[in-house]
Amino acid sequence: METRGISALGCFAASARQGRFVSRPGAQRPHCGLLCAPMDLPKGVLNNFMDLSFTSFWGQLVGNPILIITVAFTLGVIFVNGWTDAPNAIATCVTTRCLGVRQAIWMSALFNFLGVFVMTQINSSVASTISNMVDFGADTSSALIALCAALLSIVVYSVGASIFGIPTSESHSLIAGLSGAAIAIQGGVGGINFNEWVKVLYGLALSLLLGFASGWLICKLVTILCRNIELRAANRFFRVAQIAGAAGMSFMHGAQDGQKFIGVLFLGLAFSHGQNSVAGMEIPVWLMLLCSVVMALGTSVGGEKIIKSVGMDMVKLERYQGFCADLAGAACLLFSSLFGIPVSTTHTKTSAIMGVGAVKRLSAINYGVVKDMMLTWIFTFPGCGLISFVMAKIFMQIW
């Protein structure tokens, strides 16, 4: 099956329902500045085309207070994601003393920016899956209000967990928040697209298995290949290698989590134009840049408590082990992103660290920290989902 490198968000969403991609290699598409409307779309899709240039967006923003709130909440969630989730990418690099905390945070900010911007242009199918996961109904005004509630619930839950230094899964929070709001506005589970919802859960579970297995396998291979290398020379090499691995992990964090929230913001823009679907439209460049910058700013704030929890408390790592964990995590995220599977970057990285620790001995893993993290992830679905449900009901009564 051949597919274009840059796929339209709507093309994927429309064709995913039929279990296939819509693709015509070599097809020409007219260029219109920051937004391109693909011509090879299913019949009737172009009727939903809307102007998503920055000028049009600014005009909509000025006259629509609900859109202002939606955009503010979305950017707030992206910022919090950079603050709370991105430190996972550099935790091992800091705890093995390859880089100082602030150096690592600034490096992560740069590569998170590049990950969001570059990967969304290459393959935006992760954003598609997220935007297609729930149905807020035909009333786009109410849908926009419910989306506001979902986003606020994610911020509240994530900030609360971060204050106590508990690693959070923004992917879990996003799914729970959107689902709670959709159930509230539809009055039941009819607002949930279970085909997409279950696919996302499969991806989250897969991240655990792939992360652990790849971490264990890569570390085992490195241990065998480097067993005759002098320790000082190995440490010099793995210091550089781990910095590169942390940069790659940061890039893939931006690619995965950035796309998820771009998909949500894109859906909010569609609601503000009276459309309940984003089928047939590509993500504009200005939107990619905006989300990239905000995630980079959130990352620059840093989350030193989370770095300590993930990198120091879970497993005591040496430099080669930190490199193996970063390489395994980045590889799993790349695989998932290329196939459009939204996964938890937190799950992937922490399970890779556990896999690396298991090579030496199972007792090297601090199971108390692992247990706390698993309980946090388990509570995210009902906790964040309930907050979103209640907020959606309140918001719809107010507006």
Where are these regions (language model features)?
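Multi-pass alpha-helical transmembrane bundle typical of ion/small-solute transporters
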Residues: 48-399
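Extreme N-terminal basic, low-complexity initiation segments
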Residues: 2-7, 11
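Intrinsically disordered, low-complexity polyampholyte segments enriched for Lys and acidic residues
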Residues: 2, 28, 40-43, 47-48
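A cross-taxon signal for low-complexity, glycine/charged-rich
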Residues: 5, 15-18, 24, 28-32, ...
